[in-house]
């Protein structure tokens, strides 16, 4: 399992557009990928799950990936987050 914690820097947090960016990127990998925030974990491939967390700017989130391409998945998701989540 690979995991990493990130601070969300996008002004509006993870709303519809950033959530779509994350879900689309996660969908490119076969690994199980979860997003954890405030003790709740959701499937990062589920737009409804990601949106339900209500992640705002400055929030600390943990991404966990488990599977054959977990390292690549975590790296790809990290790039999306560092690029500002499409904002």
UniProtKB/Swiss-Prot annotation:
GO cellular-component term (any): cytoplasm
Gene3D superfamilies given in the database record: HPr-like (3.30.1340.10)
PROSITE patterns in UniProt: PTS_HPR_DOM, PTS_HPR_HIS, PTS_HPR_SER
Keywords linked to the UniProt accession: Cytoplasm, Phosphoprotein, Phosphotransferase system, Sugar transport, Transcription, Transcription regulation, Transport
Regulation: Phosphorylation on Ser-46 inhibits the phosphoryl transfer from enzyme I to HPr.
Subcellular location: Cytoplasm
Short name of one Pfam family: PTS-HPr
Gene Ontology biological process terms in this record: phosphoenolpyruvate-dependent sugar phosphotransferase system
Catalytic center residues: 15
Domain HPr: 1-87
PTM annotation (Phosphoserine): residues: 46
Record has Chaperone as a keyword: no
Function: General (non sugar-specific) component of the phosphoenolpyruvate-dependent sugar phosphotransferase system (sugar PTS). This major carbohydrate active-transport system catalyzes the phosphorylation of incoming sugar substrates concomitantly with their translocation across the cell membrane. The phosphoryl group from phosphoenolpyruvate (PEP) is transferred to the phosphoryl carrier protein HPr by enzyme I. Phospho-HPr then transfers it to the PTS EIIA domain.
Family: Belongs to the HPr family.
Protein name as it appears in the record: Phosphocarrier protein HPr
């Amino acid at each position: 399992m690979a995991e990493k914690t990130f601070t969300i820097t996008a002004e509006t947090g993870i709303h519809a557009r950033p959530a779509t960016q994350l879900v689309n990127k996660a969908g490119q990998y076969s690994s199980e990928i979860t997003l954890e925030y405030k003790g709740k974990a959701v499937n990062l491939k589920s737009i409804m799950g990601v949106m339900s967390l209500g992640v705002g700017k400055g929030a600390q989130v943990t991404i966990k990936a488990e599977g054959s391409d977990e390292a690549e998945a975590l790296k790809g998701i990290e790039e999306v987050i560092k690029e500002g989540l499409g904002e």
